[in-house]
C-alpha cells in the first residue's frame, strides 16, 4: 500500500510540474509577444492629421473636426482599426 501511495504522490508532483511549466511558457509568450504589424499614430488634433496620410480613408464622415489628442491604431493585415479621442 505504501508503494502505491508513493507512486501516486510522484505522479501528482510530476503532473503539477508539467502544469507549472506550461503556465510559465504561456505567460512568457504573452508577455514577450509584440504585434509587429500594428501601427499606432498620435495627433494633437484633427488638423494635425496630414491629408496624404491615409488615415482619412479610415475615418467616418461624421468624425468630429474639433477632436483633440487622437490616437489611431491600425493593422491592415487583420482589418483592425481602433481610434481613441476624448
From Swiss-Prot:
The chain crosses the membrane at residues 12-32. It comes from the Bacteria. It is found in: Membrane. One of its GO terms (cellular component) is membrane. Keywords: Membrane, Transmembrane, Transmembrane helix. It is a single-pass membrane protein. This is Putative uncharacterized protein YbbD. It comes from Escherichia coli (strain K12).
Amino acid at each position: 500500500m505504501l508503494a502505491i501511495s508513493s507512486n501516486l504522490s510522484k505522479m501528482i508532483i510530476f503532473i503539477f510540474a508539467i502544469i507549472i511549466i506550461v503556465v510559465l511558457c504561456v505567460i512568457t509568450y504573452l508577455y514577450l509577444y509584440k504585434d509587429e504589424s500594428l501601427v499606432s499614430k498620435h495627433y494633437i488634433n484633427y488638423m494635425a492629421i496630414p491629408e496624404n496620410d491615409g488615415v482619412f480613408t479610415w475615418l467616418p464622415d461624421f468624425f468630429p473636426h474639433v477632436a483633440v489628442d487622437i490616437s489611431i491604431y491600425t493593422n491592415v493585415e487583420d482589418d483592425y482599426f481602433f481610434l481613441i479621442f476624448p
